[in-house]
Amino acid sequence: MKYKVIVYYDSMEDSERVFSNENDAINELHRLRLKYRNARKYKVEMVEVDD
């Protein structure tokens, strides 16, 4: 199982990072949410993908 952390800007995909470790993906998700917490047009989410 792999995990993608996706950053959306104005409802369009801006960047994407793929992790094989769920903990690393969660850490990156929290880091990016802190970075973009005051930017209304940015949204960060994590999704699971099959290999």
Mark where each language-model region is.
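Short aromatic-glycine-(Arg/Gly/Cys) micro-motifs in beta-strand/loop hairpins
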Residues: 1-15, 41-44
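Short, well-ordered helical secondary-structure segments
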Residues: 6-7, 29-31
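Short amphipathic alpha-helices within nucleic acid-binding modules
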Residues: 23-29
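Short, mixed-charge low-complexity intrinsically disordered segments
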Residues: 14, 30-51
